């Protein structure tokens, strides 16, 4: 899980979602998981 000030989809399987007011990227590749913070 990377924590970045700006989260962007890396590949075409990345999905941008909002969870508890946080913007997150979920993907089938675990290295692409990101959270804004």
Curated annotation (Swiss-Prot):
Ribosomal protein listed as a keyword: yes
- List the record's Gene Ontology CC terms alphabetically: cytoplasm; ribonucleoprotein complex; ribosome
SUPFAM superfamilies in UniProt: Ribosomal protein L36 (SSF57840)
Instruction: Write the signal peptide boundaries.
Output: none
Q: Which GO terms describe its molecular function?
A: structural constituent of ribosome
- Which keywords does the record carry? Ribonucleoprotein, Ribosomal protein
Q: Which GO terms describe its biological process?
A: translation
**Entry-linked Pfam families:** Ribosomal_L36
The answer to whether keyword Glycosyltransferase applies is: no
Q: Which family does it belong to?
A: Belongs to the bacterial ribosomal protein bL36 family.
This one is known as Large ribosomal subunit protein bL36
Name the encoding gene, please: rpmJ
